[in-house]
Amino acid sequence: MKNKTALISVYRKEGVVDFARAISDMGWNLISTGGTSRELKSAGLEVKDVSEVTGHPECFDGRVKTLHPAIHSGLLSRRANKDDQETLNELGYQTIDLVCVNLYPFEETAAIEPPVDDPTLIEMIDIGGPTMIRSAAKNHDDVIVVTSPNQYDEVLAALSKAKGEPTKIDPELRKKLALEAFQATSAYAVSYTHLRAHETREY
């Protein structure tokens, strides 16, 4: 019975099939969303849709997919905390041991010439992705957070060395990945605020 779970939900899909296949081969369950789920399934991987985990369909054109206690309880519950684990079991939720997420390309979309209309740009504001990233990064003692395809090889090498066991990953690597995760979400927020601040000054 597989007991390690990765949630994979990426906008930039280069390398994601190979990454997912490698961790699946190490005995991991895969959870995914939308287009990522379709990509992985089309490659022959066994994937559970996030709606099967939450018991709630993706809605509002994908605006709400992972914003659910079933996801964030799995990310934020402390494995060594008995009360956390008892509560998780009472709620019927499962731990999530790795999150692989990269974000909608807001900054790249904002730079398109001629400019896209505001409704199009607004749909490039990622909400669920940064939220998952920050939850995983906060609980990096227990959760591996992957925010860029450039990290895939390093994470796979570490997992291979640990024989697929997330708890045996070097704590310093966990800290580094968490730092890079917070840097990614911070830069993402700054790109939005800079754009809107510039627009506001024009009025």
Indicate where each model-derived feature is located:
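Short coil/turn connectors at secondary-structure junctions
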Residues: K2-T5, M26-W28, A43-E46, P69-H72, ...
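Glycine-rich nucleotide/cofactor/substrate-binding loop typically near the N-terminus or early
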Residues: G35-F106
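Short acidic-hydrophobic catalytic motif
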Residues: A181
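General beta-strand structural signal in soluble alpha/beta enzymes
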Residues: I8, N29-G34, D49-E52, S77, ...
